[in-house]
Design a protein with these regions (language model features):
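NAD(P)-dependent Rossmann-like dehydrogenase/reductase catalytic/cofactor-binding core
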Residues: 1-89, 93-97, 101-176
């Protein structure tokens, strides 16, 4: 079929170009906002390790842009669910909130970092404890996502805790 000849190029971490379509991992912005700002078709993908990914396409995209993204992700062995185009999407938004809450509990002395991770991994059957997850996913990315959600919705629940800000700052210092 026509999709088998797509030109795919990894532009950077979290950004893949499929012909004229940008497939961008969520940082909290909508596909529509990105498509308008970048003046090209954008599909935002919300994925972690695992077989399921959710995508949101900009309303200004041609239908073929979304079909290309779905085809590409399916070729990677992913099950693709298309959801509404909202900031933070679904998976990342939820995980970022859990990580932020775990950092808040750590900061307030509720439990040690190891105990929080063990309790959530064994008690809720998460693949990782939220603090180990945060370190793996990147504190800066989680901070950026929560800041985008707070900016968009104006809700206090998305406010990043100060320990997240500290860890993101430390992480940025190690990357320079």
């Amino acid at each position: 079929d026509s999709f088998s000849r797509m030109k795919v190029e990894k532009k950077s971490d979290g950004v893949t170009e499929i012909d004229d379509v940008l497939l961008i991992e969520t940082q909290g912005e909508t596909a529509q906002a990105l498509a308008i700002r970048l003046a090209r078709p954008v599909v935002v993908v919300d994925k972690m390790a695992g077989k399921v990914v959710t995508i949101a396409a900009a309303a200004v995209n041609p239908d073929s842009a979304t079909r290309k993204a779905i085809y590409y992700l399916q070729q990677q062995g992913k099950t693709v669910l298309q959801i509404a185009d909202y900031p933070g999407m679904l998976i990342w938004r939820t995980v970022a909130m859990i990580i932020n809450e775990a950092l808040d509990a750590l900061q307030k002395g509720v439990a040690s970092e190891q105990d929080i991770d063990t309790a959530m991994r064994l008690g809720v059957n998460y693949p990782y404890g939220p603090l180990a997850w945060g370190a793996q996913l990147g504190w800066q990315r989680i901070l950026r996502l929560l800041e985008n959600l707070q900016h968009h919705y104006g809700e206090e629940r998305y406010r990043p805790c100060s320990l997240l800000r500290q860890r993101a700052l430390l992480e940025s210092g190690y990357e320079s």
